[in-house]
Amino acid sequence: VNSARPLGGVWEGYYAADADFWTPHPERFPRGLYPVAEHAAARGVALGLWFSPDSSGEFANWRRDAETLLRLWRTYGVAVFKLDGVKLRTPAARAKYLSLLEMVTAQSGRRVMLQQDITAEQRMGYLAAREYGTLFVENRYTDFGNYYPHRTLRNLWMLARYVPAQRMLFELLNPARNTERYRADPLAPGRYTADYLFASVMAAQPLLWMELSGLGRQDAARLQQIIGVYR
């Protein structure tokens, strides 16, 4: 949900709602994304952004979206984009979406990583367009009580038969959050340490699906240690 319209909720037709939809807000970001990019670069952190290609008109604006992604890469060094909100409901939409992926990949010399969210809608998945990046496989939240580490590991294990594990993103959450939702469940995430959770998805691309500032000191130290081993 965003504020492009009075009531928010714009998930396609972005350019019709606001021609400068993907331009950084001039008051909130008077220098564009330069301060964020500079801060990240100074700490050796690669910058990534969420991006939703415009699905309206069977991806009529696919070239405009591709140019936006390339501009963000060239201007700010954003080399990772999570592509979300995609609706591939016709063959024409699929063809144009593939053209977007091809254009960004070719013109960046494969230096831009495209993470395709495949959690909803009709989208590319395990058997198509895998060469263009990685797959964001699932959404899980302790807020809703639907995150179970053993299920995440099982999904990774079963899908690895068809997709190289390193091409998929699998999540680990802060095990100390929302423990009351799981009560006495012996498989609750709160019964694991953070480094154990990281190790359970280490064969894939581990996704720290959390606010890092909310980690307890001990879990933060354990993650720091195991991430050092992973690197």
Regions found by a protein language model. Name each.
Residues V1-F81, G85-P91:
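Aromatic-lined carbohydrate-binding/catalytic grooves of carbohydrate-active enzymes
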Residues A93-K96:
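Short glycine/threonine-rich loop-to-helix capping motif typified by GTGT followed
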Residues L98-R231:
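Active-site-proximal substrate-binding groove within the catalytic cores of carbohydrate-active enzymes
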